[in-house]
Amino acid sequence: MKRIPKGLSLLLVLACLLVLACFGTVLAQAQDPRAPPAAYLRSGTLLHRGPFPTPFKHVVVIFQENRTPDNLFQGLCHPPFGHRHSCSTTPRARQYNISTKGWLDKNSPTGVTDPGPVPLGNTYDLSHAHAAFLSMYDGGRMDGAGDIHCSGTCPTTPQFKFVDNSTGILDPYLELATQYGWANYMFQTNQGPSFPAHQFIFGGTSAPSADDDAAGIFAAENMSGTPGPAGCIALLGTFVRLVTPSGESGEIYPCFEHQTISDLLNNHGVSWKYYTPGAGSIWTAPNAIQHICVPDAPTGGKCGGWDWVNNVDLKPANVLNDISACNLAQVSWVIPIGQNSDHPGNPNTVGGPSWVAAIVNAIGNDTTCGYWSNTAILITWDDWGGWYDHEPPPILNGVQGDYQYGFRVPLIVVSAFTPRQYINNEPHDFGSILRFIQRVFDLGEGSLGFADARATGDLKGFFRFDRGPRSFQTIMAPLDANFFRNDTRTPDPPDND
């Protein structure tokens, strides 16, 4: 018998060990229900390592409130920002996926209702609880919006309305959408309201723990019980309802413990800041994470953790000061005061378009810090707000499908490397935003193992790096940065429905 050369023998042994290791990994994944889906492993995108080959050194996430594309962006379908062929419910590459008429309504004798206009600062609010999602979704028929509860001064068919732009109040949003990138298929990750939505955009899950996320158990609603602050400083008797694969079941004190993307940023020396209007707000995601808040009492206390003290800023307009002072963190979440949030139900809530424009203009017109050429700005809305939208959301397979995904929300991507009037037709959710941050800063895509791992993309299609940075043109708006810096109004509280 021929003897195998010693060097070749060693190579064969190493090859066998490699095969056994791969087999063991596959077997472990088959046995562990929390293992990443095989599709992600095959594609090699789940734990992608290596920096995104971009000039980005900063990512700013601007998180507005309670709108759908059909409700807020009808202006893309009409002059001066579009025309009757600009929009379609079966869009081609250069069309916006927006429905302008014949909205599905099972309560109408004709089966449809044509939408009508309402002001941005309107007089009523629609439920956006999990039950409201189920009503509107109606088993995938998307015709149940008329069953969503309305509170306040409600017109006829209040759910079937779009924001009136006859005064030009939405022009800053429309200018941004047509000058930069728009997502036709951006879905909120959760099927419910603001508190869980903010948990997803910051931590990738609204589950109380990593084990709960793997089991499909999520915080589904805003606070109930004793009125007061949210998160780990909530009062005794405050709770949040849970949703499980068998439906809404049980409740829990709203203080959770699991990793968030801020932990990944800390571990890699990447700075971050969360601008928000109140320590106890349901919009303040870090207040519900035990190791960030570090409350000084079991209930009803104050947050005092290192990350809380150093990285949570309770005055949103300080983002404008930090930009002008060249002190912008590498990753920022910007949560507005109620008056600038686009949240329905208050005639004073009309500052959103100017607020967003002020932040974009501060970055775009910067001549000292170099922010325009190295910052990606992601503008999105936290949930659908009970408004009609025609596009049915994809529902996840497995136990997470009991609460993911929700309805569409707008997403506008602004950067010096985003083509003019770019329309993206890939599916996205808040997990896509987390993946984008992970890839830009080499954190490992999907490494939290939550919505970031379940997302199918990371927004890279919005950018073209084979050409130099675009020059910036100021976004015209009625109110400028000085208005917001000097605004002394008491912030309107968020909804709690």
What are these regions (language model features)?
Residues 11-22:
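Bacterial N-terminal signal peptides
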Residues 27-497:
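N-terminal pro-sequences and low-complexity stem/linker regions of secreted or lumenal proteins
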Residues 7, 25-27:
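A composition/secondary-structure signal for short, hydrophobic, low-basic-content segments
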